[in-house]
Amino acid sequence: MYQSLMTVRETQIAIKEVKTFFEDQLAKRLGLFRVSAPLFVTKKSGLNDHLNGVERPIEFDMLHSGEELEIVHSLAKWKRFALHEYGYEAGEGLYTNMNAIRRDEELDATHSIYVDQWDWEKIVQKEWRTVEYLQETVRTIYGIFKDLEDHLFEKYPFLGKYLPEDIAFITSQELEDKYPELTPKEREHAIAKEYGAVFIIGIGDVLRSGEKHDGRAADYDDWKLNGDILFWHPVLQSSFELSSMGIRVDSQSLDEQLTKAGEDFKRDYDFHKGILEDVLPLTIGGGIGQSRMCMYFLRKAHIGEVQSSVWPDEMREACKKENIHLF
C-alpha cells in the first residue's frame, strides 16, 4: 500500500522549498521578470486561454459596467499582450504566479479544477523561431529540474533521484510511427518509461493517421514548434506532464491554424488582430505546473496531497482506502 514519505506538515514545508528554488532559478536562467497576474479578463478581449477549444470558462458580469468577464484558464495569451504593453524587447521576458479554475477538468490523481503554475513568456526574434531554439529552451528548463532534484536530495535523501542526465526529444509523428498500435496517451507512457524524461515536439495538428496527438488551441502555440515535457513518475508508474510550452504563432501560422480549427471568427478579437497585423511581439512561452512539480519531486500519488481543492466524496473515500490523505 502507498505510504507518503512525509507528514502533512513536512509536505507543506517542502512545497515551499520546491517553489522557492524553482522560481528563483527560472527567473535567472531564462532572464525573466516577475509581474502581477490577472485572475480574470474581459470576454471580448480574446485573452483567455481556451485550451483544447471545448472547455467552458467561468463567466460573470461586473456590476459597475455590466461587462462580461471570464476567470482565466491560463495566461498564455495575456502574457504576450503584457510584453507588448510593458515595452519588453527581444531576449527579455516575464513570469507570473498564475492561479486558475478549470471547471471542466476531468478529475483524477493528476488533474484538479484548481490550477497553479509558473506562466512565463519571452520575446524572440524571427530567426529564433526554430526547433533548435525550442530544444535549447527545453534543456535550460530541464537543467533547473535536475538541480531542483539535487537540491531536495541534500535535504531529503529519502526522496531519491530519478531524472536522467539529459532529456530526450521526439516528434509526435515519430512517436506515432514508433507505436502505431497504441493510443496517444499509451505512447506517452511508453516513451516516458523508456527515457525517464522526454519532450514531445509538435502537438495540435493532425498526424498522418488522421488523428491528433492531443488538442491545442489554434491561437497561441505554433503547432510545429511546441510540445510537452514528460517525466516517468516513480510512484504512479506512468508518464507525467510537467509543462506545455512552445514558440507562439506568428501572423502566418495563426492564419493557417484558425482556418484549420474553424475559428475564423476570432480574427476580429483584439489579441488576434495584434498578431495578424504584426503588432504583438514574437514570443516563446509556457506553463509549468507548481502542484505537478511538487507531486513529482515529493513523490506523491495524488495532486490533492500538495494542493487544496475540492474532490468528489467517492474520490476522497477511495484515496483513504489507499492511504492517500488529501489536503
Curated annotation (Swiss-Prot):
Which Pfam families does this UniProt record tie to the protein?
AsnA
Coiled-coil annotated residue ranges, if any: none
What's the Enzyme Commission number for this chain?
6.3.1.1
One MF annotation (Gene Ontology) recorded for this entry: aspartate-ammonia ligase activity
Per the UniProt entry, what species is this protein from, by scientific name? Bacillus cytotoxicus (strain DSM 22905 / CIP 110041 / 391-98 / NVH 391-98)
User: GO CC terms on record?
Assistant: cytosol
Keywords in alphabetical order, please.
Answer: Amino-acid biosynthesis, Asparagine biosynthesis, ATP-binding, Cytoplasm, Ligase, Nucleotide-binding
Keyword Transferase (UniProt) = no
Tell me which family the UniProt entry assigns to this protein: Belongs to the class-II aminoacyl-tRNA synthetase family. AsnA subfamily.
InterPro entries linked: aa-tRNA-synth_II, aa-tRNA-synth_II/BPL/LPL, AsnA
Query: By what name is this protein known?
Result: Aspartate--ammonia ligase
Q: In which pathway does it act?
A: Amino-acid biosynthesis; L-asparagine biosynthesis; L-asparagine from L-aspartate (ammonia route): step 1/1
- Which coarse location class describes where this protein primarily resides? cytoplasm
Q: Which GO terms describe its biological process?
A: L-asparagine biosynthetic process
